[in-house]
Amino acid sequence: FELAPVSGAALTGGTNGEITGTSYQNYLDKIESYAYNTMGVVTTDEVIKRLYVSFNKRLRDEMGIKFQLVVYDYPKADYLGVISIKNKCLDGVYKGDDGKKVYPNEAAAVYWTTGAEGGCKVNASVQNRAYDGEYTVEAEYTQAELIAAVKAGEFVFHSVNDDIRVLDDINTMVSTTDTFGDVFKDNQTIRVCDQIANDDALVFANKYIGRVPNDEPGRNALWMDLVKINQELQKLRAIENFKDTDVVVYQGDTKKSVVVEMAVTPV
């Protein structure tokens, strides 16, 4: 038989389960073994946000699994792997019993931002991209408020004539060090670094572990593969000023370990 396209068909017979803290933890347990660029969690619960930020930090820093996390209103993460959206969504707002406004879809901008960041090319940025999501984003800010938001590490939408656009493609990192300077506040920098880390790990796992001896010819072959990855990124204009001498591969402390040192300059 032939399938016909259908738009807006309602599903029937289903029920909504209760989402609990255990549900969020179960998801993290399941997703840990998968590869992805960006994860989003749509919640206003501070405990859940803290759980996901801790997960992101653990995987990035301890396991070398590189991805960025998109959350709503959590700039205190102060971390290059976490993107915090400032804007609330206004859809469905109502007054509660106490007379205060309640925003049931307050964190819904996470949906669009997660897709935009996850689908962004390694040589591109989400900066100044027009918002075309289905939710109504609150975006009326003064210039002083926008400047303060960027300084605080907030990913913010703002009004530009008749459009709503991303002001700057930044993460929550505001505390810099000698190792991690201002350039790491830019999500394009993180995309490039994550792409290299993930590609290098994939090549090493698929071609070298258990297959190629850790001797000079084997390490030279690995060096050539890693150089090729960076050369391709330079062709894409994701990095610049790359030289093959920027990659160094040598034996580690044990016969089974390899150390790679690499210098790259994201555009």
Set out the residue ranges of the language-model regions:
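Surface-exposed assembly/interface segments
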Residues: 1-267
